[in-house]
Amino acid sequence: MLRKYEAMFILDQDTQDVNALSSRMIEIISKDGKVIEKNDLGLIEFAYKINHKKKGHYFVVIVEATAEAIKEFERIANIEKNVVRTLIINTENEQGYEQSVQLSKTDMTKFEEERKAKRDFKKPFVKKEFNKPTEKRTFEKPAEVTVEVKEVVVEEVKQTVKPAKKVAEAKVEEVSHEEAHDFVSKMEAKYKAHLAETVEEHVEEVEVEEAKTTAKKPAAPKMSAAERAKVDGSHNIDEERYELQKYSNKLRSVAIEKNLPKKLQEVNLRDLTKKELIEYMRKVRAALAK
């Protein structure tokens, strides 16, 4: 449904192609509608700086437009860095509206001047008189009360610390080297359809090749572990993540002990998905088998 709108937008004073950008903004807001009247007010000085700039190119346009076109205009205005201000009014809601781009209700120059005038107002200084206290009163806390409070606090701390140690001890669970190897074999057999057919054996060569590729191509934005888990098939793995990380921790300690390639020693296991943890364990086992 077409409605009548009056829109004002200001372009940055340093915009390279003012005509092209203003035409694009007017074309967006008038899509599936029509332009009734428009006016280029030119380069006008602001009442106060906007984005550290003193001037801007003002444009006023009266259009019949759809709600979708208005939303798209506002979206592009938020993205385009050279559009510094926008203001849109629905003329059907304005009482006594007079259609004119010369007497535009969206022209913010008067509004800015009023704001600037208000800033010049200074609140009169009123000196307050404070009565000086005639005497200072000191409150002495009874020694017995202080001792009792300290004893209670110490006892509470002791009671709180003890169960915390038990919880920490309960969480520690060690696995052997052999158990880790058996677990990897079990995962390979169970998820054969979701894992890579072969494991990279020459890790150092892969690192060198990746370094060359990285130097030639710009770095792509890195996905988080949660984002990668949605696309790499981790949802097909039934085991809990803490169980996979438990065996991965063991194999990483073996990789450090056997001085395997740094890529296997310095990996951040917390940043790996379920599938990536299984692939990591396969790589460590393959490196140990050399």
From Swiss-Prot:
SUPFAM superfamilies referenced in this protein's UniProt entry, alphabetically: Ribosomal protein S6 (SSF54995)
InterPro entries given for it? Answer: Ribosomal_bS6 (IPR000529), Ribosomal_bS6_sf (IPR035980), Ribosomal_S6_plastid/chlpt (IPR020814), Transl_elong_EF1B/ribsomal_bS6 (IPR014717)
GO cellular component, alphabetical, reads: cytoplasm; ribonucleoprotein complex; ribosome
CDD domains noted in UniProt: bS6
Where is the region Disordered?
A: 208-233
**Could you mention a single GO BP entry for this protein?**
translation
For whether the record's keyword set contains Manganese, the answer is no
Would the keyword Thylakoid turn up in this protein's UniProt record?
Answer: no
Keywords in alphabetical order, please.
Ribonucleoprotein, Ribosomal protein, RNA-binding, rRNA-binding
Q: Which HAMAP family match?
A: Ribosomal_bS6 (MF_00360)
> What family name appears in the similarity comment?
Belongs to the bacterial ribosomal protein bS6 family.
* Annotated function: Binds together with bS18 to 16S ribosomal RNA.
What protein name applies here? Small ribosomal subunit protein bS6
